[in-house]
Amino acid sequence: MEVLREKVEEEEEAEREEAAERAERTEKLERVTKSAEVSREGTILSQDELRDLEGKLMAIEIPTQADHSVISQAPVDVTKLPPSYTTNSLKEEHLLLVADNFSRQYSHLCPDRVPLFLHPLNECNVPKFVSTTLRPTLMPYPELYNWDSCAQFVSDFLTMVPLVDPLKPPTHLYSSTTVLKCQKGNCFDFSTLLCSMLIGSGYDAYCVNGYGSLDLCLMDLTREVCPLTVKAKEIVKKKEKTVPKKYSIKPPRDLTSKFEQEQEEKRIQEIKDLEQRRLKEEEDRILEAEKAKPDPLHGLRVHSWVLVLAGKREVPESFFIDPLTARSYSTKDEHFLGIESLWNHKNYWINMQDCWNCCKDLIFDLGDPVRWEYMLLGTDKPHLSLTEEDEEGLDDDDDDVEDLGKEEEDKSFDMPSSWVSQIEITPEEFETRCPSGKKVIQYKKAQLEKWSPYLNNNGLVCRLTTYEDQQCTKVLEIKEWYQNREDMLELKHINKTTGLHVDYFKPGHPQALCVHSYKSMLPEMDRVMEFYKKIRVDGLVKREETPMTMTEYYEGRSDFLAYRHVNFGPRVKKLSQSSVESNPRPMVKITERFSRNPEKPADEDVAERLFLIVEERIQLRYHCRDDYITASKREFLRRMEVDSKGNKIIMTPEMCISYEVEPMEHTKKLLYQYETMNQLKNEEKLSRHQAWESELEVLEILKLREEEEEAHTLTISIYDTKRNEKSKEYREAMERVLHEEHLRQVEAQLDYLAPFLAQLPPGEKLTRWQAVRLKDECLSDFKQRLIDKANLIQARFEKETQELQKKQQWYQENQVTLTPEDENLYLSYCSQAMFRIRILEQRLNRHKELAPLKYLALEEKLYKDPRLIDFVKVFV
């Protein structure tokens, strides 16, 4: 009874609450009705006000929800598309039914999950399964054989269009051919094209439908460091510990105070700690300022990317590729917040794992049906093996297993072939890449600009501008990449802070220039030139120049010269204006160093040679012997050949100061010193001349570089028929000559009067008598040729008839002795002979019928010939 009483009380209370709600709704309705009546009474508009309001309303444009922005801006002619775009085959219709059934089961089992992205509409508004939209294609360009180059091409070639609804996948998914034609698309279009190219190149690639961060979905790289600015880590070589020799000299005892050293080290460490703390605070402040604002849709933004699994193409580890930016990420990267499903050209998988920790804990074993639910049977991914207990349980009922196997075989369904046409990229499209030939990407404190080749007159294809601040207002440095330059310029690096310019060249420059570093193109300024040593005859590798010095480095010379350093003095001022070439800088000192010549003893092999030109001295230092500490040295006092009175100066021992490592082995006589002195004088002249030639070469290179920068001529391959003007003009001229020759041949073939006109003298005008004679000769000649042709056919006919009669007579005479093989040969011959006779008879009869008609037709043409019409019209 108590339970019944409680139920009655509950029902009464529910009825009271319902009545109260009904009364409240009635009051609200009355209140709204009264306010509407009041507002209606107070807002009566005049005719002018109504017209103004109508005009304002007509001016308002309401944006329509259409996520197929590619088609809306670049309409596609549906009539020119293949039938596979506009209709579905029976197999595709069956696949759509299977997909719908799969989606219903998934929604029933997982009601909290979003609907599956299975069969969006294509550009013809026909539903197509996502796996059939993939068209594996191997491009004919070797550059597109690797994943990084494929991703970079897709990122450069297409323009990103954001999803209309960032929380839902698009309702349309276009074919890659349409996307390539329009050169724009959303992230799903990007990933579909990239996945098709990667699968065609042999990668185990999949399109992913998931969730990404705000920067990833909007292709925002302003918080990412540009890959071109990341410097390669220098490998620090570890110094090998030298084992001290047993009898080596011990270092002197260190008498400094260890306490003072420790105090100094503590002080230095405190300064370092303060500096590190200050830098850490500055970095934290910058990171806090650059930190992105919290995204209210974090974890809900839909994004599509490409998954590449390890295994194929020697991929060691699975990774993600963002097709919008062509950057690769680890599968544990924080930019990727979750995965709903993924697919390739063979199957479709649903992620059954929890993504509470983004994608960090996901296991990409597509053969595990617990983690990845597949849609179609017969996938190429291996399934998990059964345990022994499961196998024993299955062995108990063999019939059920067989029936189950039959059912599975019946339920298996192969993926239909792709409905997309063959993906083709023309050489022009592959070369142009970027839409309209240009693309700009904004990175963190950097801006990257790309151009297609030959778009800029100077060959510029890429420019990277690095800035000091986050707002990109103060330029730090500029890097410019060039292609197809005649001067082989490849890269320009400009440092705006120091004003240093560095030009990099490919092999092939007229002066074998490799790197040119300078601050000014004026001569006798700070600059460094590096050369390709294998191209230079003199083995010059590097040349450093300052206003007062010039240093050259050599390799591989026959005289073993490795280094030359020239010191210049102040230039002597001349009254007349003179150029740098006519008034060179005076040389004060020349230092030359040589590599070891193994064919000479160390005491005779010069290691360093100094020409002190102003002091008139020459210093020599020889190579050091093995296991020796010091080396032999000599110094020559270079004097004039004659003194002030004109007397010849004789070589004296005081003019050569020498230090011998082993003076007892051999002593150099005065004659040897005199000959060495004369040889060094000649070598000094040669060194000064070579240094002067180096100065002239620098001036020549600077002049050449100025001309090259002003002209910036581009090279064009002989195989580029569109841009190569010389080749194009030559080809057009040849085609024109061939066409004219063909016309002449045709005219000669059709000119029936040509053989008769050739008999007349050249340039002579026709008379009436000659015209009539030409006409009669042409007709008589044609009549004779018709008669000759009839006689030829008649002669062949009579010959074939006589041979057949002879063969028949031979057969009648030898009929008794013939074998069956001979009879077969005879019958075959008779059949062929009768066929030839019949054909000749038909040709002869036809010729007799057509000969008069041909004669009359030629006669009519001659009467109408412009060369004879004025003379023979009287006789018509």
UniProtKB/Swiss-Prot annotation:
Protein name according to UniProt: Dynein regulatory complex subunit 7
Record InterPro entries: CEPT76/DRC7_peptidase-like_dom, DRC7/lobo, DRC7_C, MORN_DRC7, Papain-like_cys_pep_sf
Assembly with partners or alone: Component of the nexin-dynein regulatory complex (N-DRC). Interacts with TCTE1/DRC5. Interacts with DRC3 and GAS8/DRC4.
Functional note: Component of the nexin-dynein regulatory complex (N-DRC) a key regulator of ciliary/flagellar motility which maintains the alignment and integrity of the distal axoneme and regulates microtubule sliding in motile axonemes. Essential for male fertility, sperm head morphogenesis and sperm flagellum formation. Not required for ciliogenesis in the brain and trachea.
Coiled-coil regions, chain positions: 1-33, 258-295, 679-710, 784-809
Biased composition (Basic and acidic residues): 17-40
Acidic residues composition-biased segments: 387-407
The UniProt record lists the keyword Ubl conjugation: no
Disordered: annotated segments: 1-40, 385-412
GO cellular component: cytoplasm; cytoskeleton; motile cilium
Lineage: superkingdom: Eukaryota
Annotated family: Belongs to the DRC7 family.
Keyword Cytoplasm on entry: yes
Species the sequence originates in: Mus musculus (Mouse)
Tissue specificity: Abundantly expressed in the testis and is weakly expressed in the brain, thymus, lung and ovary. Expressed in ciliated cells.
